[in-house]
């Protein structure tokens, strides 16, 4: 009887563990739903500073500006940005930086998620044709991705400082470049900066556009595998082709 009771308890515990584990898994459908809800929530919250400061008093316009920032679209309803307070300029560019890697990827790198598989959250959130788990734990993968992202941002920031930009302007430029959306703090964008600054921004926009899995492979010294990536080769091929076409198109201007 004791053996039978012990066996019954074991079976019940195994069943409860299976149910609990299954309930903690984010499937693809739940991943997309969670991503959509998080994007909606953070966009509404992100619009609040614009409205409260009076920089964008219309809530709809403020929401548009915020969504444009988080999605790194780069569209703006502002006729000019040079008169905006520094705090708003920082927040506007920071939305680009957060959105460049993805809001949920940022949260996954910070929040302790327990149990289950959260890779579908990253699949639903991250840009590009696919997202690979760089390491077994999704949270660790998110930390690696944002670690690389942060490191590239710091490197660009240092190059901009070396080119004569002040600390604040260098920070905003690095944020806008990382998101590849182009939010700036000058009405004429980068036309007012030196060729050195323009080259730095151009190079780092290209670097930030590369799949970050390739950077992880480079850190592991798997150079051949990183170079053989069809996505990376197609990416640089499209850039070179576009540069060639644009060069031919504007050659008469110079």
What are the language-model segments listed below?
Residues 1:
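Contiguous, function-dense segments enriched for cysteine-driven chemistry
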Residues 4-254:
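Membrane-proximal intracellular helices of multi-pass ion channels
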């Amino acid at each position: 009887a004791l053996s039978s009771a012990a066996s019954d308890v074991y079976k019940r515990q195994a069943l409860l563990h299976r149910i609990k584990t299954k309930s903690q898994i984010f499937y693809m459908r739940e991943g997309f739903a969670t991503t959509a809800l998080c994007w909606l929530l953070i966009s509404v919250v992100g619009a609040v500073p614009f409205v409260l400061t009076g920089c964008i008093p219309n809530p709809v316009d403020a929401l548009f500006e915020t969504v444009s920032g988080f999605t790194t679209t780069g569209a703006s309803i502002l006729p000019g940005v040079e008169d905006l307070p520094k705090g708003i300029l920082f927040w506007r560019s920071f939305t680009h930086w957060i959105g460049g890697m993805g809001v949920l990827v940022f949260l996954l790198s910070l929040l302790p998620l327990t149990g289950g598989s959260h890779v579908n959250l990253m699949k639903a959130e991250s840009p590009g044709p696919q997202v690979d788990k760089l390491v077994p734990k999704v949270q660790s993968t998110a930390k690696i991705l944002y670690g690389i992202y942060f490191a590239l941002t710091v490197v660009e920031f240092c190059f901009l400082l070396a080119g004569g930009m002040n600390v604040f302007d260098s920070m905003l430029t690095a944020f806008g470049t990382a998101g590849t959306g182009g939010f700036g703090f000058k009405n004429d964008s980068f036309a007012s900066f030196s060729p050195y600054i323009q080259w730095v921004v151009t190079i780092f926009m290209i670097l930030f556009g590369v799949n970050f899995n390739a950077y992880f492979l480079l850190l592991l010294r798997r150079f051949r595998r990183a170079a053989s990536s069809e996505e990376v080769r197609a990416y640089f091929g499209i850039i070179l082709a576009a540069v060639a076409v644009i060069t031919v198109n504007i050659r008469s201007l110079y």
